[in-house]
Amino acid sequence: MLFSSITFLYYFLPVTLFLYYAVPDKLKNLILFLASLIFYFWGEPKYSVLLLFSVLSGYCGGRCIEMVKKKKSGVKESKGRTDRVVLAFFISFTLALLIIFKYLDFGIFSINLLTGANLPLFTLALPLGISFYTFQIISYYVDVYRGDVLAEHNFIDFAAYVTMFPQLIAGPIVRFRSIQKELGQRSITFEKISDGAGRFVCGLCKKVLVADNLGMLVSYLEKADEGHWILAIAYTLQLYYDFSGYSDMAIGLGKMLGFTFPENFDHPFISKSITEFWRRWHMTLGGWFRDYVYIPLGGSRCGMLRWCFHMFVVWFLSGLWHGAGWNFVLWGVYFGILLSLEKLIGNTKLFQKESFKTAGKICGHLYVLFAVLISFIIFRVENLNDIGPQILALFRGHGDISAAVAYEIKSYTVLILLSCIGATPFLRDVWNRLKGTAFWEKSGWLLQTVLIVAGLLLSTAYLLGSSAHPFLYFRF
């Protein structure tokens, strides 16, 4: 079931919210869990059992890790490694499910490619959301092991955490420790519901009115094999509005349910370095790899060569997380190289001079935009043999663009320009300034209501005239 579908907007969500608000607080997590199962079953019935199995194993894993740690509390450290073994077992077991369903065919394909063998593929469909809920469960294991959180003893509460429909399919990656208190007790106010509805509709408009329309231009230009610069820009904007739109919708739904989810995007295209870009793009994934891979490896507290190895591991895995394909691995390694080069260059005395810092601010934006455009060509093109020609096409003249392609591009000019403006903090800053005015004190609620209703109706009108498009990150 898609957030951007009539079924979700006018059937599932109203019924779920009505029941959720109507029942006593002690039953809210049960309603949330059952609603999330229906939500998942609607779109992925054959893998619903896998989701439930993952929930059960995650619950048992947390309890076992906590139990072993309590037994170990009176044992000398040198003799007590049982908790590490238990942690490793449950992490390995949880990862095994992800590897089987997401990477098994990719591994067989790679072996066939390298050795000339003809091993049969299993052609397993990718379960929706498995990359996201697997990472949430692993973070829960590690946090229980570290003592950052207590293992959840209430199965329904834990199940509600893992399966929570707002963020189940495509994030944000919500850590248990960030919402553990809210799982037990949370307040639901009119202000939270109103703010959540506004955030949800904002994300809906991003998805339906911007990302889906840009997607049609991307599909057209891919077939036409012309206008490669516009294609690269349109796809980058489509991916941003599609994924940030989903994140906005998830955060808004979470707020309507009384939860505070972490932010996932913070205007990444205003960044002046790739390092800054990845602090603003898919922030919950970057934070996950930092806390559960990069820092445990040793982080930056080592020599430069060792640090480069840490970066390679993190970005190789990050690329692989995004998809079972060598283009995704290449995409991850590409960013790992850029980030390593930024640190190497930034550490030299020459580039620490004030004159170079000033020049960096001027050129940084252009560098980031160009590097990101190139990266998403690698991301989009699945065949490795086609990546080079697609990038070279940006710099190779093709003569005049055909009249049909030129007309198509012109018809999207306003949308692309508005999308570029919307990707900056401009609209956010205008909105925040408006909130500080006397007009807002008097009529802000009315303006907010009008915008929410208008955005919902406009998106609905568009959905009625076309089929709902799946979110791009569903395939990851």
Positions of PLM-derived features:
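Membrane-embedded transmembrane alpha-helical bundles that form the catalytic cores
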Residues: M1-R475
